[in-house]
């Protein structure tokens, strides 16, 4: 199963395929009212450090874990911009587990275990395949995560 190319941003517009084509992409299921929400700061730092080298960070709001992302698209966008200065792409809210798991997360999880909580991370190589998965407790400044990003970037 290939990486889905028909993705919709938080503001309801289609994500242009060239945004992720031939790029290294870090998908992260995010939430605004979680103990791990401060990871947004680290994701912004990763975006600044590796964005020009070909890393694309994409946040995927999800309300499946403790209803910690209840906001509307506008509320999510305002919160992330105001509190964390998020400039990377946020997709529309999605289910990452269960019978309504989005096609994106069907691809990312594959035959693996369900996502355990907010801020699970999937690193996609330039070939569009999953090269690494990191649990929610792995912070964006983790040396193993950075090493995987650098390796994928070449």
Swiss-Prot record:
CDD domains associated with the record: GSH_Peroxidase
Catalytic activity: a hydroperoxy polyunsaturated fatty acid + NADPH + H(+) = a hydroxy polyunsaturated fatty acid + NADP(+) + H2O
Thermal characteristics: Optimum temperature is 37 degrees Celsius.
Any one GO BP annotation for this protein: cellular response to oxidative stress
Family that this chain belongs to: Belongs to the glutathione peroxidase family.
Protein name: Hydroperoxy fatty acid reductase Gpx2
SUPFAM superfamilies with a match to the protein in the record: Thioredoxin-like
UniProt subunit comment: Monomer.
Organism: Synechocystis sp. (strain ATCC 27184 / PCC 6803 / Kazusa)
Induction: High light, methylviologen, and salt stress conditions increase the expression level.
Gene: gpx2
EC number: 1.11.1.22
Residues that span the membrane, as ranges: none
Activity regulation as described: Mercaptosuccinate, pCMB, and nethylmaleimide act as inhibitors of the catalytic activity.
């Amino acid at each position: 199963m290939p990486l889905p190319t028909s993705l919709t941003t938080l503001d309801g517009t289609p994500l242009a395929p060239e945004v992720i084509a031939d790029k290294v992409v870090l998908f992260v299921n995010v939430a605004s009212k979680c103990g791990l929400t401060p990871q947004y700061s680290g994701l912004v730092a990763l975006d600044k450090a590796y964005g020009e080298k070909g890393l694309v960070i994409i946040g995927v709001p999800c309300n499946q874990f403790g209803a910690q992302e209840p906001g509307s698209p506008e509320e999510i966008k305002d919160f992330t911009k105001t509190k964390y200065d998020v400039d990377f792409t946020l997709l529309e809210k999605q289910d990452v587990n269960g019978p309504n798991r989005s096609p994106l997360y069907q691809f990312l999880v594959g035959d693996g275990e369900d996502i355990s909580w907010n801020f699970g991370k999937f690193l996609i190589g330039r070939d569009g395949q999953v090269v690494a998965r990191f649990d929610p407790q792995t912070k964006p400044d983790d040396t193993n995560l950075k090493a995987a990003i650098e390796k994928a970037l070449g």
